[in-house]
Amino acid sequence: MVINFEELHPQERAELERNIFFSTLEQLKGWARSNSLWPMTFGLACCAIEMMGVGSSHYDLDRFGSFFRTSPRQSDVMIVSGTVTKKMAPIVRRLYDQMPEPKWVIAMGSCATAGGPYVNSYAVVKGVDQIVPVDVYIPGCPPNPAALIYGINKLKEKIRYEARTGKQVTNK
């Protein structure tokens, strides 16, 4: 349908200009993906308690379009919170591999980002980024639910930026 703006009444033209947005398909997909993130919770330690708090009524992650999923096949974001041991590392990788593309990873807390206070243990992985590519790091021991919401918003910005520019800003 072609609209000739010269033939329209000035009020109609102004209304159309306010309500019609021009974009690329990639930007539209990026906007849709960023506003409908479905994180898979992978709580391994005390940070998981803070992650559960995000789903409570006080913070209500649902209002941002994110719904916690329990299956990796229904998720596009993996939130790793807590200490990742060498025994747990293959399971984390398997769950990541089961997620459909596009997929993102958030490392929540000191243990997931760099090993935390257990970094010198022989059984602890020195950061989940040694197993799967991480897109957003959330520091803290443990980080509060507001920090997780901030991290999810940063991931949304990253998704939109990648869709807008065509540049991938990941370490994949």
UniProtKB/Swiss-Prot annotation:
Its cofactor is [4Fe-4S] cluster. Disulfide bonds: none annotated. Coiled coil: none annotated. The keyword Disulfide bond does not apply. Binds 1 [4Fe-4S] cluster. Its EC number is 7.1.1.-. The keyword Cytoplasm does not apply. Keywords: 4Fe-4S, Cell membrane, Iron, Iron-sulfur, Membrane, Metal-binding, NAD, Quinone, Translocase, Transport. It catalyses: a quinone + NADH + 5 H(+)(in) = a quinol + NAD(+) + 4 H(+)(out). GO terms for cellular component: plasma membrane; respiratory chain complex I. It is found in: Cell membrane. One of its GO terms (biological process) is electron transport coupled proton transport. [4Fe-4S] cluster binds at residues 46-47, 111, 141. Belongs to the complex I 20 kDa subunit family. NDH-1 shuttles electrons from NADH, via FMN and iron-sulfur (Fe-S) centers, to quinones in the respiratory chain. The immediate electron acceptor for the enzyme in this species is believed to be a menaquinone. Couples the redox reaction to proton translocation (for every two electrons transferred, four hydrogen ions are translocated across the cytoplasmic membrane), and thus conserves the redox energy in a proton gradient. PANTHER family: NADH DEHYDROGENASE (PTHR11995), NADH DEHYDROGENASE [UBIQUINONE] IRON-SULFUR PROTEIN 7, MITOCHONDRIAL (PTHR11995:SF14). This is NADH-quinone oxidoreductase subunit B. It comes from Bacillus mycoides (strain KBAB4). The lineage of its organism: Bacteria, Bacillati, Bacillota, Bacilli, Bacillales.
